[in-house]
């Protein structure tokens, strides 16, 4: 066991984190550069949890089957911030946000018990009613194709992808670590999708990942 400060970030250094949360154990696995790696990591994680007598589902007092409440958050990005598709192509994030806004089933089909403006992952049209009008203005300023300003997409959307209180962490599309002006640890080119509940089986989780990969590829090809 190594204690102290974490080493400087380096794409050659892979790590995973296990953190106790109220009622759940949060596991952040290392990035996967291929579908085969993601499948292997996910199946291994579920298998190790099962052997430790840990589950990804629970039953309510009335017998209803539900998730753990911990969430199955999905992080997308690149090996380095320069490789991040969301910093290279701001219109990719704009396409994903509007696609989710036009297809509410993507927000609710895989969600947990708590949805809406006061949930952990409110949609962009749930938190504030005027946000859609401001979002329209922001998207009009969004350039098409690749850009050289990595901060551009963050500045255009940081005040919109929030909850009722303006917290960027509690949003369906979390850009806390996209290109935050606050610290180096917030400029990683990462997008976190927080609207997914923990699935009961590894294959269901992989199905969700496959759907997201397909939508990202579609929006990259046809913004």
Segments and roles (model prediction):
Residues 1-68, 79-223:
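C-terminal accessory/tail domains of diverse enzymes
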């Amino acid at each position: 066991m190594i204690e102290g400060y974490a080493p400087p970030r380096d794409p050659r250094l892979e790590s995973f984190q296990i953190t106790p949360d109220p009622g759940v154990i949060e596991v952040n696995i290392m990035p996967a550069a291929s579908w085969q790696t993601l499948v292997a990591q996910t199946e291994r994680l579920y298998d190790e949890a099962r052997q430790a007598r840990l589950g990804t589902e629970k039953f309510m007092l009335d017998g209803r089957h539900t998730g753990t409440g911990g969430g199955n958050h999905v992080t997308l990005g690149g090996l380095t911030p320069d490789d991040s598709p969301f910093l290279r192509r701001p219109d990719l994030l704009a396409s994903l946000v509007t696609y989710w806004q036009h297809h509410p089933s993507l927000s609710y089909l895989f969600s947990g018990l708590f949805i809406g403006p006061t949930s952990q992952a409110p949609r962009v049209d749930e938190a504030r009613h005027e946000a859609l009008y401001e979002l329209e203005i922001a998207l009009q300023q969004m350039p098409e194709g690749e850009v050289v300003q990595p901060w551009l997409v963050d500045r255009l959307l940081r005040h919109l992808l929030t909850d009722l209180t303006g917290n960027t962490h509690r949003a369906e599309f979390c850009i806390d670590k996209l290109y935050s002006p606050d610290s180096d640890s917030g400029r990683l080119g990462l997008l976190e999708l927080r609207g997914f509940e923990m699935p009961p089986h590894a294959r269901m989780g992989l199905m969700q990942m496959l759907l997201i990969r397909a939508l990202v590829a579609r929006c990259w090809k046809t913004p």
